[in-house]
Amino acid sequence: MARYLGPKLKLSRREGTDLFLKSGVRAIDTKCKIEQAPGQHGARKPRLSDYGVQLREKQKVRRTYGVLERQFRNYYKEAARLKGNTGENLLALLEGRLDNVVYRMGFGATRAESRQLVSHKSIMVNGRVVSIASYQVTPNDVVSIREKAKKQSRVKAALELAEQREKPTWLEVDATKMEGVFKRIPERTDLSADINEHLIVELYSK
């Protein structure tokens, strides 16, 4: 399945919630009618079955992290193999993706921009360039911007935007040095309460 390249707000409207696919901190409901589905007048949302609700939740999380369908299923399989709560394991794996960590640290304004920074070899982990967005960052790893990329205006703009967002407690960021430490794997209470990972587990358990 190819990566979606269309309007970002359309995806958020389809899921009925802000997926944080656009840069900035302004609430998405000030930009568009989030309660309406995509379309000139917004198609009336049908009443969903249990399966439909589970599918929508999976799509919402998958699109939030910018992961393709096959990748997402593989993350679920890995989460199910690990000890502990499968749903929480899934979120931890998604949060540990390098592109997501770059975004959380404020080096990219969006996850898509952060993914581009990684693929363009602008990101280092423990002093070595890593160009794979799905690379799993582990506790105590140091993530930094390469020297030649520190002057990019988009990186500076992203750091300014990040100052307006809530700072993740599981990360330690030095904006001046443009580097951060992945201190620990985030706990469920650290992450958005808007995600219902139990629905995703129910979907894949069928």
Curated annotation (Swiss-Prot):
<comment type="similarity">
    <text>Belongs to the universal ribosomal protein uS4 family.</text>
</comment>
<feature type="domain" description="S4 RNA-binding">
    <location>
        <begin position="96"/>
        <end position="156"/>
    </location>
</feature>
<protein>
    <recommendedName>
        <fullName>Small ribosomal subunit protein uS4</fullName>
    </recommendedName>
</protein>
<dbReference type="InterPro" id="IPR002942">
    <property type="entry name" value="S4_RNA-bd"/>
</dbReference>
<keyword id="KW-0699">rRNA-binding</keyword>
<comment type="subunit">
    <text>Part of the 30S ribosomal subunit. Contacts protein S5. The interaction surface between S4 and S5 is involved in control of translational fidelity.</text>
</comment>
<dbReference type="GO" id="GO:0006412">
    <property type="term" value="P:translation"/>
</dbReference>
<comment type="function">
    <text>With S5 and S12 plays an important role in translational accuracy.</text>
</comment>
<dbReference type="InterPro" id="IPR022801">
    <property type="entry name" value="Ribosomal_uS4"/>
</dbReference>
<dbReference type="Pfam" id="PF00163">
    <property type="entry name" value="Ribosomal_S4"/>
</dbReference>
<dbReference type="GO" id="GO:0019843">
    <property type="term" value="F:rRNA binding"/>
</dbReference>
<dbReference type="GO" id="GO:0015935">
    <property type="term" value="C:small ribosomal subunit"/>
</dbReference>
<dbReference type="InterPro" id="IPR018079">
    <property type="entry name" value="Ribosomal_uS4_CS"/>
</dbReference>
<keyword id="KW-0689">Ribosomal protein</keyword>
<dbReference type="Pfam" id="PF01479">
    <property type="entry name" value="S4"/>
</dbReference>
<comment type="function">
    <text>One of the primary rRNA binding proteins, it binds directly to 16S rRNA where it nucleates assembly of the body of the 30S subunit.</text>
</comment>
<keyword id="KW-0694">RNA-binding</keyword>
<dbReference type="GO" id="GO:0003735">
    <property type="term" value="F:structural constituent of ribosome"/>
</dbReference>
<keyword id="KW-0687">Ribonucleoprotein</keyword>
<dbReference type="InterPro" id="IPR001912">
    <property type="entry name" value="Ribosomal_uS4_N"/>
</dbReference>
<dbReference type="InterPro" id="IPR036986">
    <property type="entry name" value="S4_RNA-bd_sf"/>
</dbReference>
<dbReference type="InterPro" id="IPR005709">
    <property type="entry name" value="Ribosomal_uS4_bac-type"/>
</dbReference>
<dbReference type="GO" id="GO:0042274">
    <property type="term" value="P:ribosomal small subunit biogenesis"/>
</dbReference>
